[in-house]
Amino acid sequence: MIIAIDGPAASGKGTLAKRLAAHYGFRYLDTGVIYRAVAKAMLDAGADLTDEARAAEVARTLDPSRFDDPALKSHAVGEAASVVSAHPQVRAALVEFQKTFAAAPPGAVLDGRDIGTVICPDAEVKIFVVASPEVRAHRRFLEAQSRGEPADEAVILSDIVKRDERDKNRSAAPLKQAPDAVLLDNSYLDIEGGVRAAIDIVEAVRAGRRRV
C-alpha cells in the first residue's frame, strides 16, 4: 500500500506521515528533505538558486547521507528549497528516486506537494493536509524557538503566504489537491487528533468502504 500525503508548508503533513508509517510498519520518506538537501548544497556552494542547470546537477548527484543534516530544518533552507523545487529539471531528476522508494514492499508513506498528483498518482490512499496560514506560521515560530533560533512570526507568516503562491503557481508539479484525495484540515486538531483522523481514512480504504 502507498499512502500519499500532500499539503503546503507547515501544515502538519510530515508529523502525520511519520506517525502513519510507524503505525502500519511502512517505510517513510519526507520528500521535502530531498529538495532541502539540494537547496542546502546550492547555498553551501554559493550558487545562484535560480540556476536550474546547476541545481539539476546537484539533484542528480545528491548524497542521501545529507538527508539527516539538522541544518536542513532551518527557515532559510526551507525558503531556498521552495525556489529550487520549482525547476522542472530538478523535479525530473528526483522523480525516479521517489518512485522507487514508494514501490518497495511492504508499503510506503510519502509526504510532499506532488505525491498524489505526480509521484504516486495510483496511490491507494491520498490525503491532502491543510491548515490556515496563521496557524502554520505560529507552528514554525514555535519550532524555531525550540531550536534556539531568532524568529519573527510576522515575517514567517509573510514567507508562508509567498511560498504558497510559488508552490501553487509553479509550472512543474504545482501544489494542488488530487481529485481523489481526502481533505484533512488540522488547523485546530492536536497531533493525536490529526493522526486518528488520518488512520480513519486509511482504515476505510483497507476495509473496502472507500476508494480514496
Swiss-Prot record:
Reaction(s) this enzyme catalyzes, per UniProt: CMP + ATP = CDP + ADP; dCMP + ATP = dCDP + ADP
Sites where the protein binds ATP: G7, P8, A9, A10, S11, G12, K13, G14, T15
EC number: 2.7.4.25
GO-annotated molecular function: ATP binding; CMP kinase activity; dCMP kinase activity
Principal subcellular localization: cytoplasm
Record's keyword annotation contains Kinase: yes
Single biological process term from Gene Ontology: pyrimidine nucleotide metabolic process
Subcellular localization: Cytoplasm
Keywords: ATP-binding, Cytoplasm, Kinase, Nucleotide-binding, Transferase
Gene Ontology CC terms: cytoplasm
Keyword Nucleotide-binding: yes
Enzyme class label: transferase
Family, similarity comment: Belongs to the cytidylate kinase family. Type 1 subfamily.
NCBIfam families: cmk (TIGR00017)
Protein name from the UniProt record: Cytidylate kinase
Organism from which the protein derives: Rhodopseudomonas palustris (strain ATCC BAA-98 / CGA009)
Classification lineage: Bacteria, Pseudomonadati, Pseudomonadota, Alphaproteobacteria, Hyphomicrobiales
